[in-house]
Amino acid sequence: MQIEIKIDEKCKEPKIIVMTDKMTDEVNAIIKRLSDEQPQVIAGFRDDVVEVLEPSEIYRVFAESGKVFAETNHGEYAIRLRLYEAEQRLDSKTFVRISNSDIINLKKVKSFDLSFVGTICITLSNGTVTYVSRRSVAKIKQLLGM
């Protein structure tokens, strides 16, 4: 993919033109990302205090007991989004759903343990251990290039 920037003093508003011979998943992803105006931050609630959580600080987003939580360096925060809404809001190249109840930040993964039959054990850099569901194993192996 080539990127070209032209500076024009007459231009009052940035304009993006995508030139391609056919529509591909890559082109659709670029268009979606450019047109997405949703905020990329998530509000986390803990002890009657609301904090803005940057996606780069989030290790994982998970559902437990009917509630959704985001785990960061500073602990766990309740978030008022459904898991699929959090998945849509977070960058799909960085955050991957590994089960019906867990989305992980690939940049925060310390190791993948493939010795388990039918699943993958993931250790995050903060020490949290989580498991890939059988349904998601193929997707994770593809991400790892296996």
Positions of predicted regions on the chain:
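A broadly conserved detector of short glycine/acidic/proline-rich loop/turn motifs that flank catalytic sites
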Residues: 9, 22, 48, 83, ...
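Short, structured patches in soluble enzyme cores that scaffold and shape functional sites
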Residues: 20-22, 126, 134
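Phosphate- and divalent-cation-binding pockets in alpha/beta enzyme and binding domains
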Residues: 26, 139-140
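Conserved binding/recognition cores within well-folded domains
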Residues: 28-125, 129
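Short hydrophobic/aromatic patches at helix-to-coil boundaries
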Residues: 141-146
